[in-house]
Amino acid sequence: MPIKVGSKAPDFALKSKSAAGLADVKLSDNLGKRNTVLLFFPAAFTSVCTEEMCDITAGLGQYAGLNAAVIGISVDTPFAQEAWAKQNKIGLTLASDLNKTVTKAYDVLFPNLAGVGDTSARAAFVIDKHGVVQYAEQTVTPKDLPNFAAVKATLSKLK
């Protein structure tokens, strides 16, 4: 089970790769400024994850209007994430949890997915600008998408 609503969200520093190079992505960078949506996903270059991140990219303006930053987190390398983002025109920040420390901190590890090893489960968290989890969902299977209507409804209450 993922960490619970009302819990203090674990801070993190993960790597993200873009044309500008490697950069740190930290939850604490948003604290006091805006809410954060964390979207854990199993793997780049897979059909459901691509669909999810492309849909989120198309709706980034809505999330910005709800005073929220969106960060996608997987256990892929930042270089694989960058190549996948370029190939699919994914516009949100992707952060590499290669060592699975953040995935474990949020308790969303999916053990031995399809026989290829441990990955992040598909999960969504809304964290308010004070660092408190306001929404937490882990999908039953990696094929299922989070309830994005509930994510947006939570954000609209926090604006």
Regions found by a protein language model. Give the residues of each.
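Chalcogenol-based redox active-site neighborhoods
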Residues: 1-159
